[in-house]
Amino acid sequence: MVLKTVRRQPIYYKANRFAVIGADDDVIWPSYSKMLDFELEWGCYIGRPGKDISKDAARDHILGYTIFNDISARDAQGREMGGQLGPAKGKDFDTANVMGPCLVTPDELGDPYDLDMTVRVNGKEFGRGNTGEMLWTFDDVIAHVSQSETLHPGEFLGSGTVGNGSGLERLEFLKPNDVIELEVAKIGVLRTKVTKP
């Protein structure tokens, strides 16, 4: 059911814009979770406003690209998804959205869909992928999201998790004090430490 829907159109959720942190900031473990996970993603920032943007014009609205670690409380997410309304507390807590280490403009990046991606936990490679593995390009996503809805400068769109880019796939979750490094060619390394109060 989910795969059929995802192949038919881009699926997305809107994250808490107040829960964003940057490179080298600590992720604070949410009190209600025992299964914290990372997601190897990248994303784009909107630079020009627009509504009903065509796929052909979408790239003109992209200001730049960065790396995105979509931290997820998998136990909470698992309970919520049965309600078929998307993630809530599984992805909505302070420090859940890690972005950085910089913003790379489209002219600096060149082809955005041929960049190698790697995730390391405590210095050990966990998984790798390529930006070209996206089912829907950012052009597709912008065209879809902007239907009858204005996109504003500063809005951020994530790619979705790259294959082998999360612990969920291997049922290996984070531990307190783990250090996660997400690397995307031509963008850099996004480093984050997990702390538990």
Task: Kindly give the residue locations of the regions a language model identified.
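Active-site microenvironments in enzyme catalytic cores
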Residues: 1-125, 195-197
